[in-house]
Amino acid sequence: ILFCFLLGPKSVFALEDFQSVQSHSFVANVASRVSPSVVRIDIEREIQTDEFESDLLDPLLRDLLGDLGTLPKKERGQGSGVIIDSSGLVLTNAHVVERVDRVAITLQNGNQVDGTVIGTDQVTDLALVKIKEFPGLVSAKLGDSEDIQVGDWAIALGTPYGLESTVTLGIVSSLHRDINTLGFSDKRLDLIQTDAAINPGNSGGPLINSNGEVIGINTLVRSGPGAGLGFAIPINLASKVANQLLANGEVIHPYLGAQLVLLN
């Protein structure tokens, strides 16, 4: 009885301490550290549309009227980005900010600032945006995408469907996934594959490891029955592209000046 009396209270305190430590998962800790560096990107671009493209117009009448010109129309889109430098540099996807008239960046604290596209690279689907210096900007810590392995934890942060500060968890499902096998023959990329949920609006947001380091930039998803596969651009490549965009506004890619033909 004396033995239990002496150890009992100490054991209870130890258990309470353990439960306190375990009250939040590593995902919560990582998300709280990285979320201030994740931004929402809203864009506007002007497109030309058929003046009589309305579904209310009878198809026969539309054919009789013919081509009577086009009308300008405002198109709006949304994506994600990650602050990679506290001076206001935001890394995102090229398809998020290409040919835009206006870029608005919403920070985690709700403040919205205008952004300027420094440059885009269609081959790697990466872009660099500069926002004006704003007090308290927090840059994310970049990891080493050569150091990750299949089975490592993968955490996706972003604003899918405009839902800010969304966090999803998965693993690295595969490495060096050729983007050409996914139907994008105009790009040259080996992607990180993950089962962390990535949806429209996640594009340009970071893929994070369990240490809170950015290992990739989320770029596309393959959905459908039995699918739901997400893909991210390795951060080592993204960093190189960002440096070139910052220095030159563009990325120069080497190519072979030759054409393959079939010989009979």
Residue ranges: model-predicted function:
Residues 14-264:
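Serine-dependent protease modules
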Residues 1-9:
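Bacterial N-terminal signal peptides
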